[in-house]
Amino acid sequence: MSYAQTKTQSKSGYQAGVKDYRLTYYTPDYTPKDTDLLAAFRMTPQPGVPPEEAGAAVAAESSTGTWTTVWTDLLTDLDRYKGRCYDIEPVPGEDNQYICYVAYPLDLFEEGSVTNVLTSIVGNVFGFKALRALRLEDIRFPVAYIKTFQGPPHGIQVERDKLNKYGRPLLGCTIKPKLGLSAKNYGRAVYECLRGGLDFTKDDENINSAPFQRWRDRFLFVAEAINKAQAETGEIKGHYLNVTAPTCEQMLQRAEYAKELKQPIIMHDYLTAGFTANTTLARWCRDNGILLHIHRAMHAVIDRQKNHGIHFRVLAKALRLSGGDHIHTGTVVGKLEGERGITMGFVDLLRENYIEQDKSRGIYFTQDWASLPGVMAVASGGIHVWHMPALVEIFGDDSVLQFGGGTLGHPWGNAPGATANRVALEAVVQARNEGRNLAREGNDIIREAAKWSPELAVACELWKEIKFEFEAMDTV
């Protein structure tokens, strides 16, 4: 549409027509309130569109505005309900890119609904013709709004208490091949990994229910494997049983069956299933005492492009509100996308209670979580024993280090692969606790441990040359 102003005087005195968004929605003198929901957008206007007009258009189209003045504006108090573009900053090193800051009144959003927040803020405006590209970089959720959410079913401390495991990261493994195994062979793979020393095994994101492996059969054989491994090792074990299903009713049916089998943890694909389904499941998990592991399948479709989409830190914050005890975050050192500063920025947003603004890590707003439970970060994707020192140094104790191929690819089988990872982890944690520098001495620590663990020695030899050295796309 043209940005020239046009007006028509109606008989009632109402000024009809089209006017620039910035006349109403660009308010550089506005000071955000503690109760405002704040959003930072990376904005690329079309040629000829001033950044102030584009920023105001984002504020308008994601709150109360539309393309023309409407007479029903007179029936409400727009100053109370409209979004406001209150600041615009050019992006250093980029032509025609700006960070646009928008403040939204809290009354615009339904209590306890991530679905409603995202529908409002990103539901329509991303297709707006005045913008060449738009990316939601961050959201500041006000404390008043956070208090309307349950959040994670249990949180980090409750999980450790349930598992009776403290002072180290937890170890996991995704069963491979992800598709094609019968339920019985799948259960056998789970048992071998758990008896070898892992804390968890995991369904992959696309394991739901298929002709070669129906969900009920998988649950039964996995439960048998867990019971046997627990009896042999004396440790509490778990498997992330994926309850993602075609309908919410079927999802809850699968969750109930996992509960009947006395399983400690289930799993959900929160983006493909949707936030309404995820919040429903998270509340069920709290009521029934079951941990909830979250997979982020489909996230890169949304967050990979630097100038358009939604940054994963927003999806991570939304998950903490919706509910989940674990979520995949990337590894920094493995095969999946993730630059260290950016990754640890959203890992802190998942785990900590209060996070200060730090734009060097992509954190555009100070976030107070009002004591909402934290979410454990899951590092998964292309990692092996040589990565263990870096993973412990980067992610710390409140994490799950998940070795799929790094367990199942061991030449001697699943159990020795699991043992190699457990020995490496225990050696690295002991070295850290003794004051050794993991970044500088990590390889030496692994070599020393391999002298008395043949399983680890074989793993070290197999993966000594494996690296994933590509430039990260996700940078500030």
UniProtKB/Swiss-Prot annotation:
Biological-process GO terms, alphabetical: photorespiration; reductive pentose-phosphate cycle
UniProt-annotated catalytic positions: 176, 295
PROSITE patterns xrefs: RUBISCO_LARGE (PS00157)
Binding of substrate, residues: 124, 174, 178, 296, 328, 380
SUPFAM superfamilies in alphabetical order: RuBisCo, C-terminal domain, RuBisCO, large subunit, small (N-terminal) domain
Reactions performed catalytically: 2 (2R)-3-phosphoglycerate + 2 H(+) = D-ribulose 1,5-bisphosphate + CO2 + H2O; D-ribulose 1,5-bisphosphate + O2 = 2-phosphoglycolate + (2R)-3-phosphoglycerate + 2 H(+)
Protein family membership: Belongs to the RuBisCO large chain family. Type I subfamily.
Name of protein: Ribulose bisphosphate carboxylase large chain
